[in-house]
Structures are given as C-alpha cells and as structure tokens.
Amino acid sequence: MTPGEVRRLYFIIRTFLSYGLDELIPRMRLTLPLRLWRYSLFWMPNRHKDKLLGERLRLALQELGPVWIKFGQMLSTRRDLFPPQIADQLALLQDKVAPFDGRLAKAQIEEAMGGLPVEAWFDDFDIQPLASASIAQVHTARLKSNGKEVVIKVIRPDILPVIQADLKLIYRLARWVPRLLPDGRRLRPTEVVREYEKTLIDELNLLRESANAIQLRRNFENSPMLYIPEVYSDYCSQNMMVMERIYGIPVSDVAALEKNGTNMKLLAERGVKVFFTQVFRDSFFHADMHPGNIFVSHEHPENPQYIGIDCGIVGSLNKEDKRYLAENFIAFFNRDYRKVAELHVDSGWVPPDTNVEDFEFAIRTVCEPIFEKPLAEISFGHVLLNLFNTARRFNMEVQPQLVLLQKTLLYVEGVGRQLYPQLDLWKTAKPFLESWIKDQVGIPALTRALKEKAPFWVEKMPEIPELVYDSLRQGKYLQHSVDKIARELQVNHVRQSQSRYLLGIGATLLLSGSFLLVNRPEWGLMPGWLMVGGVVVWLVGWRKTR
C-alpha cells in the first residue's frame, strides 16, 4: 500500500470506530485478532452510543465522502445483505456535499471549450453553484448564441484519484466477506463492488449522460407525461454538460403541488405509466428517479407533466428479460408460484438444475403473507425485492439491470404513494403488462417481426439463387458421401458376419478335437487334425475382424 492509501485507511478505520461500527465484526475465531486489536485502540471510542446501528452506519458513510455515500445508496437496494433497519437507513443517504470553488469550475469549463474564456460562449455565468453533489456541481448561465437559459454541469476536479483509491479499499474489504460470514460466498461481494464501480465510472463521463438524456428526450417527444430538458451537445465534453434550464415544482413538495391545483391522482398514475413505458416499450429507463431528480411542470396542473433530470444512470432489458419479468409480475399477482419458479429456470436467472418444487415452496413461504393485504396496499417493489432475495438463495446470478429496475420501481412507488396514498399500482400497471404480453404473440408480433427483418431479406434476396445452387451441390456431395459410407458399412457388416461364422467353426473344431483326444484315443491322429484345423479357421476369422 502507498502512504496515501495507508492514511486513507487510517481515516476510514478511525471513522468506523468513532461510530461504533466494530459491532458489525462477527464473533468468530477468525476475527479474534481484529476484535483484540480494536480494544487496543482505546483512544478511538464510540462517540455515538445514543444512536442505533443503522443510523451510525449512515452517518459514517456520509462522513467518508462521495464514494461511500453512493456505495451505501446502492447497498440499500440489496436488502438480502442487511437487516431492514440498516437498509432503511442506507436509503436515507443524501448525495449532497459542500460545493467546490466556482473559479475551479470556471477554469474547467474554459479548458473543455478549448481555452477560450467562459464569456466567449456564455453570458451571465454564475460563479456560485446552483447545486452540488458528490461527483459534479451545476452552474447557471445563458447561451451567447441564442440567449437561452442553461445549466452547466461540471465534474469535480481531481475526483478520479479519490474514487480509485477508495474502490481499491472497498475491493479489499469485499474479499474478506466470504471468510468472515457463513453466507458470504453466496452474496458475491466482489461482484457487488464491480457492479458499483461500473456505475460510478459511467457517472464520471458526462458525454454518456448527454447521450442518455438525448435518447430519453426522443422517446418521450411530445408526451404529456414526461419532459426531458434539451441537451446542447455542441457544448458537451467528458467533464462538462450543458442543458436547458427548467423551472418546476420538486415532486417531494406536496404542499406546493396542491397549492398549484395539481391533479395528484393523475400525477401518481402517470409516474407508474412512465416507468412501465420506459421499461417495456423503450427498453431504456431512467434508473435514478429519486425525488431530487424529478420535478413537475407549473403549467397545466389539471394535466400534470413530470420533468426528469440527471440521466447519468440508465438501465435496459433485452426482449427475453422483459417477457419473463412481465409474466413474473402477472403470475405473482395471480399467486401462481409454480409459474414464477418455472419462469426463473427458463430465463436462466437461476441454474437449470434448480429444484422447481423447493423453489416454488420458498417463494410461497416468503410471498403469501404479502398477499394477505388488499392489492392497493401491496408494494410492487417489495414483491420484486422478495422474489430476488429468495432467488439468490437458489444461486441466482447478480443481474445488474434487474437490480437497477428494482431500485427504480421502489422510487416510483414511494413517490406515487407520497403524492396519492390511495394509489393502486397493480390496477394501474396490470392493463399495461397484459396488453404488452398480448402484443408479443400472435399476428401483430409476427407482422412486426417480418417488418423488422424485411431489410435483411431484401439485402440477401440477390444471393438466394447462388445459395440454393450451393445447397443443392452440397446436398449432392452429401448424398455421395452417405452412399459411400453406406456401402462401407455394408461391406463391414458382411465381413463381420463372415468372421463370426469362421470363429464359430474354428471354436467348434477345436473343442471337438479336444473331446475326441480325451475320450477316443483309438481314433489316432484325427482329433489332432481337427484341433489344428480349428486353430487355422479361428485365426482366419480373427484376421477378418481387424
């Protein structure tokens, strides 16, 4: 370890101990040196004994900075890793940190724009940030070319080395988990960290976020349900992103929405429809839809429209996963647990040798209590959560896109019920899912598939005569080969029959000669000639078998 890594490790240990997180170390022989070592650090007492363990963990992660905050947020979606009281606290982690100097942001913008001063591209650039988070911060300005108000998102300077150093330490901790916890290997901690690393590195590339926002905006162009601000891609780079400034009511400000006369029932239902439209129609969904990233337009409160920002994290599902997911939801709410278990095996989410009966029983045991509630009170997100947690006990592979989907669904559901507590998510989603599944089979699906494949067949059409000729020629050669093999097999069969016949005669002569030699000595040389003849015939038959 480098001196810098040692200092950082010391700071992390000191922070964990000051919040009493040594309680998380399991009491076993392997951890005895760790526990004894903790007692030797008597000058680092637990300074927060009045707080519960989950809250202490959350505060410690916030103190450690952006990498650990985001790691905690991601872990909050993996409720198979922690008890509910800890997972609930991790879900409260806020990605808000002190802003960095606006002059540094200005220098980064000028570097990204080829060294020209900010004033060459923007008017009214505000040196004070509008918002600040762990990875980037946002400044307001006005485009010089057309006078439109924009926000400029800038990556924090020197954030990458900090992230890389902390990730190394997190990887080291992850490698210890299978040794410290009896169930540690099944939890695949290294895969969890690898998944987190990919998400974090993606967030550092603002060109990727720009592309995501452009795609989402195109998907919901002219939609009354969702508006994505325009991205000015000519001004975007890996460290800087420029997009339209929006004005809206934060979705968490229920009082302001009600004051504006917003149709809260329609707004809540539209949130559900937006989510399922992204997942099943577009196969491309905003995977960071927490309340801080969602606003509601001031205009047309009777026909409310969401505004989505911060498209750094997105997810996608392939056709097979979408179909299995939709069928899983419908089977779940029909309480067809056998179907759910079979779908998991068919999809490859769990190993093919999984015992379907045992899996069905495990799902039933976990989920039946949920369905004792009225459907309107059942959490779609928690159903999915229980399903995945149960499947992981049967060695379900970590599916990053499904984890993102589960997290997003929990956000959507939480926001929807905050806006309209009577929201029946299943009643809103079921017609959409049934319509989508119906659209995937029958004549409409066949017509769509033919339409999708038409360009391919048009391109291949001129090659078809040649392909047919080649196939016929290969078929002719194949027939010759088959005939040749058949003849050889026939010859071999005849040869084998002859050899078996000769071996039988040889053995008979040999046995007859032996019998006569013992019982009829008066026959003279005859038994001997029979035995010699038997050996000769047997040898001839044996040679034919080779």
Curated annotation (Swiss-Prot):
Subcellular location: Cell inner membrane
Chief subcellular location: membrane
Any Pfam family hit: ABC1
Single GO MF annotation: protein kinase activity
Annotated TM spans: 501-521, 522-542
Keywords from the UniProt entry: ATP-binding, Cell inner membrane, Cell membrane, Kinase, Membrane, Nucleotide-binding, Transferase, Transmembrane, Transmembrane helix, Ubiquinone biosynthesis
Disulfide bonds: none
A GO biological-process term: regulation of ubiquinone biosynthetic process
Residues reported in the UniProt entry to bind ATP: L130, A131, S132, A133, S134, I135, A136, Q137, V138, K153
E.C. numbers: 2.7.-.-
Domain Protein kinase: 124-502
Active site: D288
CDD domains: UbiB (cd13972)
Main EC class the enzyme belongs to: transferase
Topological relation to the membrane, as annotated: Multi-pass membrane protein
Pathway of action: Cofactor biosynthesis; ubiquinone biosynthesis [regulation]
Similarity field: Belongs to the ABC1 family. UbiB subfamily.
HAMAP family (alphabetical): UbiB
Function: Is probably a protein kinase regulator of UbiI activity which is involved in aerobic coenzyme Q (ubiquinone) biosynthesis.
Protein name, UniProt field: Probable protein kinase UbiB
